[in-house]
Swiss-Prot record, chains A, B, C, D:
Enzyme nomenclature, EC number: 1.2.1.38
Keyword annotations of the record: Amino-acid biosynthesis, Arginine biosynthesis, Cytoplasm, NADP, Oxidoreductase
The protein's name: N-acetyl-gamma-glutamyl-phosphate reductase
Lineage of producing organism: Bacteria, Bacillati, Bacillota, Bacilli, Bacillales
Gene Ontology CC terms: cytoplasm
Amino acid sequence: MKKAAIIGGTGYGAIELIRLLDSHPYIELAKIISQSQHGELLDETYPHLATYVTQPMQELHIQQLIEEIDIVFLATPAGVAKEIAASFLDSSIQCIDLSGDLRLSSSDYEMWYQKKPASEALLEKTAYGLTEVFQEKIKQANIISNPGCFPTAALLGLIPMLENNIIESKGIMIDGKTGISGAGKNSSAKTHFSTTNENVTPYKIGTHQHIPEIEKYLSQHVEESSVRVTLTTHLIPMTRGLMCTMYAPLQQDIDTADVIDLYKHYYEQSSFIRIRKQGEYPSTKDVTGSNYCDIGAYVDKRTNQLIISSAIDNLVKGAAGQAIQNINVMNGWDEKTGLSFLPVYP
Amino acid sequence: MKKAAIIGGTGYGAIELIRLLDSHPYIELAKIISQSQHGELLDETYPHLATYVTQPMQELHIQQLIEEIDIVFLATPAGVAKEIAASFLDSSIQCIDLSGDLRLSSSDYEMWYQKKPASEALLEKTAYGLTEVFQEKIKQANIISNPGCFPTAALLGLIPMLENNIIESKGIMIDGKTGISGAGKNSSAKTHFSTTNENVTPYKIGTHQHIPEIEKYLSQHVEESSVRVTLTTHLIPMTRGLMCTMYAPLQQDIDTADVIDLYKHYYEQSSFIRIRKQGEYPSTKDVTGSNYCDIGAYVDKRTNQLIISSAIDNLVKGAAGQAIQNINVMNGWDEKTGLSFLPVYP
Amino acid sequence: MKKAAIIGGTGYGAIELIRLLDSHPYIELAKIISQSQHGELLDETYPHLATYVTQPMQELHIQQLIEEIDIVFLATPAGVAKEIAASFLDSSIQCIDLSGDLRLSSSDYEMWYQKKPASEALLEKTAYGLTEVFQEKIKQANIISNPGCFPTAALLGLIPMLENNIIESKGIMIDGKTGISGAGKNSSAKTHFSTTNENVTPYKIGTHQHIPEIEKYLSQHVEESSVRVTLTTHLIPMTRGLMCTMYAPLQQDIDTADVIDLYKHYYEQSSFIRIRKQGEYPSTKDVTGSNYCDIGAYVDKRTNQLIISSAIDNLVKGAAGQAIQNINVMNGWDEKTGLSFLPVYP
Amino acid sequence: MKKAAIIGGTGYGAIELIRLLDSHPYIELAKIISQSQHGELLDETYPHLATYVTQPMQELHIQQLIEEIDIVFLATPAGVAKEIAASFLDSSIQCIDLSGDLRLSSSDYEMWYQKKPASEALLEKTAYGLTEVFQEKIKQANIISNPGCFPTAALLGLIPMLENNIIESKGIMIDGKTGISGAGKNSSAKTHFSTTNENVTPYKIGTHQHIPEIEKYLSQHVEESSVRVTLTTHLIPMTRGLMCTMYAPLQQDIDTADVIDLYKHYYEQSSFIRIRKQGEYPSTKDVTGSNYCDIGAYVDKRTNQLIISSAIDNLVKGAAGQAIQNINVMNGWDEKTGLSFLPVYP
């Protein structure tokens, strides 16, 4: 039984980690750490955890963690995580950072996050936790940068097609749609029910920090120059769920059926990727509460475009679920351990 | 490992049973039976079950079930269930009926359901599956009538107060609020998104078949005459969740704190009942996806009324979850077996 | 053409007044006043008003208002309104206060709002703006206290029954359900989408400031002692809409049909009250965006209770619409002036 | 006062026409015709129309209409409309067809609708009712083919850019998002609340009948060859509202500010088009219940793409509102007549 701690215990990422870890057979959640609310009981904020919570949230003590804990999940905001992660560099702690701090090169991080980047030493030791694609690196790493929610859905849909030279590396459009929980727990106009309900709201057009993240990891899969993508993101009036509808120019004449076969082959060993059959496309509700990423595809012969639809639960495969999946891989456990439940439907 | 079958495999009750049984350690779901869709794969209707489903739904063969199966869940409509349940009377099958067929006396059933009632022989052998209250009878029964969703929330809130003579048995008002999944999977004006979204819709006022069910089981807890309740039900624009807000005249001068203590004491041994502390009330979201029933109370001294708020997930504690809880009790397993997960929040 | 000003221009009450006044034939909205945001353009906060807004919001200058303006709508928070309203006491300004400041007696206000009450001089000159019931007083008043949203729905349903001695004045239960816009424009956990969506949340049980308001105006309609009601309120995952489901002990043996006839007779002259026929009940969506209050009733012979269901749009009949209806009555215009549009459906 | 009739009186298009015509100063709605429900009162299906409806729906009698009526709105399904419209060819009736029957060339109609097309005589006399762009033709026509909901939003965003050679005519991607009312009044899995709530559902990918409609009217604005677009459509869990997020390769180096100026200039005379300022994008809620189309734009210099976001209420500008706007133009009235109300917000 490994001992885990969550740092940043009061956001939605942490709350979902708590739910998922509760049924993990090899991990015991030993500490929930919150700098802003230590001393408080978590179920005062989250009554759905009534009877679950037995001890108050704790302050952060790095040395104590290094001594007592095996696994640390960083569910802190960008900017905070990189400092904490650096403290574990020389320890044996397995650290999963759910923020964006360790996802980009220093220069890109500075430009898109407008914060000071993590040290090169830290970035070099960090593996990007898109489990299905980077699991060899994940197995050997102690520090994982857990992917952003849009990048998870986008990369899982695009990488197999780019690797197989099905689509061009230029002219890829990603239309992202996310539930409001993606905007976090803080109250603002952006998360106000009366503002967001019965509404579709585009946001951060052209400026979303997930753009360079998607481009960085796509570029690792084509030889030549760097890939550029266009990403728009939209708030959808639902709590959970994220979809990327993607458009990419075809490099070759291919049928939908063959594209689907390619996907199936690519993800043959991946328990959490489900490919829809021809003529069917995933809905976000098909994956709610689960770690699945469902993918559908359509070759538009009229316009020579491949249309890809990729759906995840932003809090599971897009955050806490993938974090646990990475921990499973790092520890040599089956990637499904503690994650093999069906979606909650309807 | 016990073998289970679900009969009526395509409604929401069945779908939730499938989700929950999938993580039950002692039950294997061996057969999904559907008279209307046998031969089909369930994931054609429900793509969220993709990769889970490996064999088509089957026709109903009673004798085969008796030979091969240990546990049968009846997720069929009222009217159908009682015929099937009767076939198992002399077998060793443990049968849980999720319909209303076995919940009322013959005369009440005829009046409120306007169908021919089950045989007296069947009714006599049936235990009412409100697990927390009737577990002694459930342990000894082979046939369980699983409670309706409103009765579950209402009875769990009212019974401790009636038993302890806190409230009068006359003048109880129950204001029921349910998510649209309570109206089932069939498409109609009542379940149409454009009709029900951004809407509160009262329905079946004074005529809901859950009225006699609540009255029957409340009456078993007061000596004198029969209890009468007023129940209204409202469709709420959400998928899951059910709340009963209840009003009952106080029999004695008592404080909120004492009422809360009484509840805590009454449900001391019950894993799934959580009592809110003074000044707090449950939201339906606090129990989503879980088998919990959360209860809050307030003594309104100004009007001498007890106000009780009781929240469940209508598809879990109000249907499939309680069915499995009953099976656990019938088999001597911990009632939490396969049901000990946290709510999905947010 | 009368000139109007709105004070407190950035809340939902003001925004709805702007929408409704825009099509009023006899009122010109001359000023929008905001102490916190004067100098700003309202469409920066509310882009749906783009092209409508031509001048910035202004500071409050009482004397200037008295000289230039005929009608003032106070859409300010409780506590602020009573100070401003007092300034108009000796002027010819018609002032409608949408806050709770002028609704209660001094002692009740102090107890339930926990603020210093308005002066007796102001309270004496104020008429309560439940248009259908108090129009004679409204015609003669210059200062109107516009009713709260729950009291509007509750009183319109209860008063005809109390006046006609159909129901008892004791044992009335009001189960209130409101859309999230009722919680206002400010961001908080209570208005957060992820918290409130897919959820029913009871709040302020036993402590809602609308309780004494309902009781005060009900009591004016029965000779004997004062009426006491039990009110609970619930947040429903919708933006607009409010329903009171009410339960009251019958004083006499009467049929549903006769109750409905009584309502129809009582509201014969009232353009905005629509009585549902026997067996039908209003949904909140039936009145969305309109000034209607729809009422349905059912005599529960089994329990000797009258069940009343009353639905309004909380921002229209529950706030801005009724405010304009009152202005119409005060000026001798048809009460429908500027308000005679159909509900927005679906 | 012109007399109008609606044929197909029970769908959402008709219901919205009734709401809007009710406040039109020059049009009297004289007849509501329904082949399937004639003899019934419309408020039996739609209680929000209680007190509005005074006469039952009628059967269709073409000759009677020609004699008594000036304006006919066809709110019938595709396939039915073209037969009725043909009957008015030699009459003086102004006919607006809200279905897709008259929008495409015969060959395209046959291919995409898989029905027999309208006669050439009828198609030749029909003007396409995208009011802002085709008003000269609309003024001279008696028969109008009212645009589809997605084409309205897409064309209003794309045409000014194509006409001004800002974007290429190849490689245009349109990501469409619509509220569930776009799927109509009929109950099906696609409109079931429990299926569609908390969900984003792609549908008709590559096969939507709005694809050839968009292409046909875009092609009329570029000299050379025909334009091809990629369109995907998604059901969003909201009742009303439609957004097209569009991506098009830039033909020239241009700044966002200049693009916005071009839009403003193009729509200078158009009362219902509102262009967002730089850095802001429309939400569907900004136009709910109104005839506005709000447009925002962003030049993505990184990828040399123009991103356009265009939002309408699918039932107003996307159907009934635009139909009335066309009637206004045909009769020489101000296009805003009866449509100049503000959006319903929040």
